[in-house]
């Protein structure tokens, strides 16, 4: 009887801890979604941001925002034990997997764009043409969808007929009932990460060589591009570190349930949320043209409201004076 009571109290405490931590995450996710949304709005409002560099940045903002939202919904669903249909969970996890690959692949494309702009300035306009930009976006989404779609097809095929109408608490683990599928995903993602890291590394080296041989007036912009590539590399490493978090979760779960919860939330903040904070830093704050436009639209609403209030107060005073007259 006492053991049952203690177990019930322990489960209640764990459930309460999960909900409290998930509420903390909501505040951070809400702030980041607002900032990213404001940046996307700024991009859409200004025609000057229609070149390849800013288009890729806007895609990064969209993908990161969508990924944060999907990951956050998964976190809330796990904390509050919300059940959904298993096929809906498969689709949900497939979209989230696609976004999680699309984000670093877009970062690699942004590094390549900086390489072309700095090392091949005479060919930058032709390579970064609108047609090539659209083709590049299609390639990014095509490459990003290969692994998730394969996993979805295999998971759907191996799901027993009696489980097709079941309801589950949605997480990535639901899709990996077949052991070899999880191993294949881990191997393919690690291979993709190595390829992307090699591309970013070679881009960095070539830009660094160009920076040393650049003239005095070009050195500043070249070194700025170099710092941008470094930040993208940091984003890539932090983002892809999520590949090892499942193994950390398994190890901590064997030690203590509370340690598992704390480590899981720390991993979520460090490898899911923090890398998505770097995109606004890289472009939103460091790029003067975008920063000025962002600042204008961030405070424009306040100024507009003040103007409307002044106009309304003048109208009311005028109406009162006419009535008295």
Swiss-Prot record:
The record's listing under SUPFAM superfamilies reads: Family A G protein-coupled receptor-like
Q: Which residues cross the membrane?
A: 23-43, 55-75, 92-112, 136-156, 191-211, 228-248, 268-285
Q: Which UniProt keywords apply?
A: Cell membrane, Cytoplasm, Disulfide bond, G-protein coupled receptor, Glycoprotein, Membrane, Olfaction, Receptor, Sensory transduction, Transducer, Transmembrane, Transmembrane helix
Its source organism is Danio rerio (Zebrafish)
Q: Name one GO molecular function term.
A: olfactory receptor activity
Under InterPro entries, the record lists:
GPCR1_Superfamily_Member, GPCR_Rhodpsn, GPCR_Rhodpsn_7TM
Question: What is the stated purpose of this protein?
Answer: Probable olfactory receptor.
Summarize the subunit comment. Homodimer. Monomer.
Per the record, ranges on the Extracellular side are 1-22, 76-91, 157-190, 249-267
Spell out the subcellular localization from the entry. Cell membrane; Cytoplasm
**Gene Ontology annotations for the cellular component aspect, listed alphabetically:** cytoplasm; intracellular membrane-bounded organelle; membrane; plasma membrane
What family does this chain come from, according to its entry? Belongs to the G-protein coupled receptor 1 family.
The UniProt entry, under PROSITE patterns, shows: G_PROTEIN_RECEP_F1_2
Extract the Gene3D superfamilies matched here. Rhodopsin 7-helix transmembrane proteins
Name of the protein: Odorant receptor 131-2
Residues with attached carbohydrate: 2, 6
Membrane topology classification: Multi-pass membrane protein
Cytoplasmic compartment spans: 44-54, 113-135, 212-227, 286-325
**Cysteine disulfide links:** 89-170
What is an annotated GO biological process for this record, any one?
A: detection of chemical stimulus involved in sensory perception of smell
């Amino acid at each position: 009887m006492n053991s049952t009571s203690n177990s019930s109290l322990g489960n209640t405490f764990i459930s309460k801890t999960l909900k409290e931590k998930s509420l903390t995450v909501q505040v951070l996710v809400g702030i980041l979604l607002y900032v990213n949304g404001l940046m996307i709005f700024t991009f859409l409002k200004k025609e000057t941001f229609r070149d390849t560099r800013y288009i890729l940045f806007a895609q990064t903002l969209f993908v990161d925002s969508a990924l944060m939202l999907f990951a956050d919904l998964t976190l809330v669903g796990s904390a509050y034990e919300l059940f959904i249909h298993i096929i809906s969970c498969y689709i949900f996890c497939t979209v989230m997997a696609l976004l999680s690959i699309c984000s670093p692949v877009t970062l690699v494309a942004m590094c390549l764009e900086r390489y072309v702009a700095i090392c091949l300035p005479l060919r930058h306009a032709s390579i970064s043409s609108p047609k090539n930009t659209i083709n590049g976006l299609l390639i990014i989404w095509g490459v990003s969808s290969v692994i998730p779609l394969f996993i979805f097809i295999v998971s759907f095929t191996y799901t027993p007929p009696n489980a097709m109408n079941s309801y589950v608490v949605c997480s990535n683990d639901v899709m990996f009932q077949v052991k070899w599928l999880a191993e294949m995903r881990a191997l393919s993602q690690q291979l993709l990460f190595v390829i992307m890291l090699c591309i970013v590394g070679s881009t960095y080296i070539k830009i660094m060589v160009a920076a040393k041989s650049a003239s005095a007036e070009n050195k500043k912009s070249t070194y700025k591009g170099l710092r941008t590539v470094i930040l993208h590399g940091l984003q890539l490493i932090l983002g892809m570190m999520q590949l090892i978090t499942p193994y950390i979760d398994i190890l901590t779960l064997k030690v203590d349930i509370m340690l598992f919860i704390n480590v899981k939330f720390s991993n979520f903040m460090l490898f899911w949320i923090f890398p998505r904070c770097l995109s606004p830093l890289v472009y939103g704050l460091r790029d003067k043209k975008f920063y000025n436009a962002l600042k204008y639209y961030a405070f424009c609403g306040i100024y507009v409201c003040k103007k409307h209030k002044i106009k309304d107060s003048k109208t009311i005073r005028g109406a009162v004076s006419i009535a008295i007259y």
